[in-house]
Each structure stands twice: as structure tokens, then as C-alpha cells.
């Protein structure tokens, strides 16, 4: 059973904060989603599971999504899921599961509240606060109140957040409540009270780096000292609020630790790091491709260049005088900067985000060679842009896996794509195990084709295995036909894994489970994502500069804590005469947009 708040004044404060009329909690103060999507009477009939909120650019799942779910299984998933997900189709699916209301499963109120607390961490931030704002006024769980307050801190709604914190009179929340009180005092410039609250936070005997960071930050705020020796932290609302108070913004290391609702909350913060923040948010499905494109509309434009290549043919002298060699003009290249932007992406997920950003401009690119057109076809496929995919594939010799990926993108049942994949000529990059692995992903996603016997004749490569217990729960959820439970366990099974190294047979089981509970589109997207992730080749990373520990120190001066984050790799002068990548392995000079 859930724990009750001890002080009824706290209940009144919490209720008032949750029932604020129609204002959402957007960072700019503008209204967002209407507060109540479910009327009070209807809410009593369907319970907390009927509450939902809109995620921009996404369709909610059907109202039967929670049907036949096991309460213990989904409760475990709610508690164990983190925002650390590299399979972005599963990130999108998790958002749709958490923010879709439907018929209640057989589960207690505690489990239903776990859904709201997870939604508060996963984001996007506007959807999180809109969902939490619809909780009824009889919810008295301390940890739910803390989740609401932390989400409001992320959304920069300081007064509402601190009203909830100040109203709680409980000792059951441990260190979290003490830290939140310290943050609220600091945000209100009551630094002595903030330092006292930090000193009284319960200790566990282990060093708490967040508590140490907060103590240092509050001391600096109190003294008005420079903040050059304090770095941005943004893993939760408390850290974001203090970082904003100090005027900090994330460096690369801090941004790599920022996920979910916390990351989406800082997309509107103006700083030198905003371009990198927006790219990361786009690659993690926290903003739409359209939102990212609108942000970057003045950054990316289609360049036109006219390469001139000197003739290699020797020219004879005329009357003893040397003659300059003839130059041969080539057709203009349109949009090489678009190609370079994509090819120099720092990671596969960044490449996905950048592909969405340039979707409307991709079709304008012309004049590239065969291998480069094949590379751009991948962006069109991951965007679901059939016309552009066919255009670029028509200007190259498609690689065996690209034909399979295109068929997954188009949907339907392609009886030849799998067969062509299995019959493709062998090469070091197209061994039999690789071909059968990709065919297995396509089979699992619903593509039909001959060749299943190859699974008996081929030893598939073994990659990183998901937890066996999670996979067993997934099989049980599949047998019950629970959409939401299968979606949650699919996310949990691949949490923290790399699409390039995850065990392909296990991923195929997950793809098949999604398909068989009615999530066919999501299954295809996941299979497509994995096939491209395992094949695409981006520019090699730049040479790493030795770290401070690896080289002699010449100065005791520390670098500034806040430095602007580059959007792509370092720029080198463009050389349109340089050889371009081959069809089998794109290689290019490193460029920055």
C-alpha cells in the first residue's frame, strides 16, 4: 500500500499545485496541454490508468494497451527503466506507452503511481508536467509529490515546486526531501537556511557527489564567488535549477549524463551549448524533427559549388613557350555541405537526428558520386522518405542490406527482399552469418520470404545478451497479448545496449514480440533501425588529444567549466577535388557544416 502524507496542510498545498487551472507548466509560461483529459466521474471509473497526455508528433496507443498486463511485471519495469536507451524506436514507444491512457490492468494504486513517476523522468518535459497535473486531489504518496516537484523545477516553475516541498512534513523521503528544501532556500536567496538544510541531509556513509556539488554551489551563491570551478549538472530538476541560478550550461561530459525530461527541459535555455542540446534531444525523440529543423533553419542551407579539375593530359609547347594545361569543368555540386553534415555526425543517433533535420532539403542534393548517393539514401530510408530513397538508390548500386532496409521502410510483405539478401555475393562485409542475421530481423518484423532453413545451417554471431529474466517476462507478456507490457519489457531488455553489438537473435525475439501484439509498425521501425545501425559507416573520429593525465602539465590554470560544444567534427577546408568514398565503405575528408 502506498504511504500517506502525515500533514494535511501538505495535502492541501499539493492539491492546489496539481489542480492549477489550464496553465500547463511550459518553460515559457504559455499554456500547453489542457489540464484534464478525463472528467472526474470518468476518472473514478477507469482509475489513474485512464489519464493520458499528448506527446507532440506522436499518436497515442489504443485504449486497450494495458489490457492483460501483469501488475507485478509492469511495476518492476516502471522501477527499473532508466532514460539510458540507444534504440530510439524503443524510446519513442516508451513515451507512447507512458502517456497513453486506457483501461486499467489488474494492479494496485502504488503500481499506477509508478507510471507517473517514470513519465516524470522520461519526458518530454511538457508532456510530463501535463500528465502529472491531471492527478486527482486524493493522491497522498510522498514520492509522487517529490516527483511532481522535481518536474516543476525542471520546467522552471519554481513557486509551484517549492510550495509542494514546503508543505511536506515527513521523514520518510530520506535525503531527497532535504536536498529539495536546500534548493528551494537557495533559489529564494536564503543561503544560510540552504546551507543548514544541506548539513542536515541524512548521510548513508558513502560520498554523495551530488550533495557535495550542491554544497559547493550554494556556498558560491552565498559568497557571490565566481563559478568557473563549478560545472553544470542536469540529471534532475534540482540540479538544473541550481545550474540555471549559477548561469551554467553543459559541456560535453555533462550533456552525456543528461537524459529524458531533464534534457528536454533545457532545450529552451539560451546558451552556447544550445545547438548541441537540440541535436541530442532530437536524436533521443525528445523534440520532433520538425522542431529541430525549425531551430536550425538559419544554420543549414544548400550550398552550390562548381568543382574545376585540371586535365591530366600533357600539353605540348607552342613555339617554345609553355602553355597552361586545359581545365575541364564539371557540373555543379548542389548540397555537398548537407552530405558532409551527415557523414561527420559524431554518433549513429546524432546521424539519425541530423537526417531528420535536413529531410526537406535532402532531395535538392545533386552531383555527388555513386557511393555518396548511396550514403544519402540511408538518411532518406531512416526518415521514411520513399521518394528520396528511390531517387538516391537509383543513382548507385544498392548494397545488399539497403534493399532489405528499403522494403522494411515501405511496409507490406515483400517476398523477394529477403531472398535477394540471402543470395547476395559474399564479401568480408557480407558474410553468411551477417546476411542471415539481417534476414532474421526482417522475418521477425513481418517480411515474408523463403530461406528460413538457413537459420538451422548458420551459426549466428553472438552479441551482448539482454537479461534472461527480462526476456522470460517478455515471452509471458507476449502470451497474454499485452501491448504495454511487451513495450515496457522490450525497452528494459535493450536498455543501455548498443544496436551495433546487441545479440541479433535476442533483438529479433523482441521485434517479433512487438509485431505479434499488434505493434507491427513499431516492430518494422526497430528492425530497420538495427540493420542500418550495424551497417552505416560515418567519418572516423578525429585524433584524440592526450588528456591532462597523459601529458606533462605546463600550467596550473584550470580550463573554464563552460565551453561551447561543437555540433559536428572539426572543420577542414573543403577540397572538391579529393577522392570521395567507395561504394562499399564511404570515406571522406572530415568537414564541419
Predicted regions and their residues:
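Bacterial N-terminal signal peptides
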Residues: 11-21
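Extended amphipathic alpha-helical segments with heptad-repeat/coiled-coil character used for oligomerization
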Residues: 160-252
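Generic helix N-cap/helix-start motif at coil->alpha-helix transitions
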Residues: 73, 105-113, 137-146, 171-180, ...
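Residue-level signature for tetratricopeptide repeat
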Residues: 118, 147-152, 184-185, 379, ...
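Structural motif corresponding to the intra-repeat A-B loop/turn of tetratricopeptide repeats
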Residues: 122, 155-156, 188, 383, ...
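Compositionally biased, proline/threonine/alanine/serine-rich low-complexity intrinsically disordered stretches
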Residues: 25-51, 539-593
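Solenoid-like repeat scaffolds
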Residues: 59-68, 82-83, 98-105, 132-140, ...
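Long, internal scaffold/assembly segments composed of regular secondary structure
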Residues: 214-390
Amino acid at each position: 500500500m502506498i504511504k500517506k502524507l502525515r500533514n494535511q496542510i501538505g495535502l492541501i498545498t499539493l492539491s492546489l499545485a496539481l489542480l492549477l487551472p489550464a496553465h500547463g507548466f511550459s518553460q515559457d509560461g504559455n499554456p500547453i496541454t489542457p489540464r484534464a483529459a478525463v472528467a472526474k466521474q470518468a476518472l473514478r471509473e477507469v482509475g489513474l490508468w485512464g489519464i493520458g497526455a499528448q506527446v507532440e508528433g506522436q499518436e497515442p496507443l489504443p485504449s486497450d494497451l494495458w489490457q492483460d498486463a501483469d501488475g507485478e511485471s509492469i511495476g518492476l519495469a516502471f522501477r527499473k527503466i532508466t532514460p539510458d536507451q540507444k534504440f530510439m524506436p524503443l524510446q519513442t514507444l516508451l513515451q507512447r506507452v507512458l502517456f497513453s491512457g486506457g483501461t486499467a490492468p489488474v494492479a494496485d494504486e502504488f503500481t499506477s503511481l509508478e507510471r507517473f513517476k517514470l513519465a516524470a523522468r522520461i519526458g518530454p518535459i511538457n508532456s510530463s508536467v501535463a500528465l502529472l497535473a491531471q492527478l486527482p486531489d486524493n493522491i497522498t504518496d510522498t514520492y509522487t509529490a517529490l516527483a511532481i516537484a522535481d518536474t516543476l523545477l525542471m520546467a522552471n516553475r519554481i513557486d509551484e515546486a517549492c510550495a509542494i516541498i514546503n508543505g511536506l512534513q515527513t521523514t520518510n523521503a530520506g535525503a531527497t526531501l532535504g536536498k529539495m528544501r536546500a534548493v528551494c532556500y537557495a533559489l529564494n536567496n536564503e543561503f544560510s537556511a540552504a546551507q543548514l538544510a544541506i548539513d542536515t541531509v541524512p548521510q548513508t556513509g558513502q560520498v554523495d557527489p551530488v550533495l557535495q556539488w550542491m554544497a559547493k554551489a550554494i556556498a558560491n551563491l552565498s559568497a557571490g564567488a565566481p563559478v568557473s570551478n563549478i560545472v553544470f549538472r542536469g540529471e534532475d530538476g534540482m540540479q538544473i535549477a541550481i545550474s540555471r541560478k549559477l548561469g551554467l550550461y553543459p559541456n560535453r561530459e555533462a550533456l552525456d549524463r543528461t537524459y529524458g525530461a531533464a534534457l528536454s527541459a533545457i532545450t529552451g535555455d539560451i546558451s552556447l551549448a544550445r545547438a548541441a542540446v537540440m541535436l541530442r534531444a532530437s536524436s533521443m525523440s525528445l523534440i520532433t524533427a520538425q522542431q529541430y529543423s525549425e531551430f536550425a533553419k538559419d544554420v543549414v542551407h544548400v550550398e552550390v559549388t562548381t568543382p574545376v579539375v585540371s586535365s591530366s593530359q600533357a600539353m605540348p609547347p607552342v613555339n617554345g613557350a609553355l602553355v597552361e594545361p586545359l581545365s575541364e569543368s564539371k557540373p555543379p555540386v548542389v548540397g555537398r555541405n548537407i552530405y558532409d553534415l551527415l557523414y561527420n555526425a559524431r554518433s549513429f543517433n546524432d546521424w539519425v537526428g541530423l537526417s531528420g533535420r535536413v529531410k526537406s532539403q535532402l532531395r535538392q542534393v545533386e552531383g555527388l558520386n555513386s557511393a555518396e548517393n548511396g550514403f544519402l539514401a540511408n538518411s532518406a530510408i531512416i526518415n521514411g522518405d520513399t521518394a528520396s530513397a528511390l531517387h538516391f538508390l537509383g543513382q548507385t548500386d544498392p548494397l545488399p542490406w539497403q534493399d532489405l532496409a528499403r522494403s522494411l521502410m515501405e511496409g507490406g510483405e515483400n517476398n523477394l527482399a529477403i531472398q535477394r539478401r540471402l543470395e547476395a555475393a559474399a564479401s568480408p562485409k557480407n558474410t553468411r552469418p551477417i546476411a542471415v542475421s539481417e534476414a532474421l530481423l526482417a522475418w521477425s518484423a513481418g517480411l515474408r520470404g523463403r530461406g528460413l532453413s538457413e537459420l538451422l545451417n548458420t551459426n549466428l554471431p553472438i552479441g551482448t545478451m539482454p537479461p534472461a529474466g527480462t526476456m522470460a517476462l517478455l515471452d509471458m507478456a507476449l502470451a497474454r497479448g499485452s501491448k504495454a507490457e511487451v513495450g515496457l519489457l522490450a525497452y528494459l531488455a535493450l536498455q543501455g545496449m548498443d544496436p551495433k553489438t546487441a545479440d541479433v537473435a535476442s533483438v529479433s525475439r523482441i521485434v517479433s514480440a512487438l509485431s505479434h501484439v499488434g505493434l507491427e509498425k513499431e516492430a518494422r521501425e526497430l528492425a530497420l533501425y538495427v540493420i542500418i545501425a550495424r551497417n552505416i559507416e560515418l567519418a572516423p573520429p578525429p585524433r584524440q588529444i592526450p588528456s591532462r593525465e597523459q601529458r606533462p602539465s605546463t600550467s596550473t590554470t584550470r580550463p573554464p567549466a563552460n565551453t561551447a560544444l561543437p555540433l559536428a567534427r572539426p572543420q577542414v577546408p573543403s577540397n572538391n577535388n579529393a577522392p570521395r568514398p567507395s561504394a562499399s565503405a564511404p570515406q571522406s575528408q572530415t568537414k564541419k557544416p
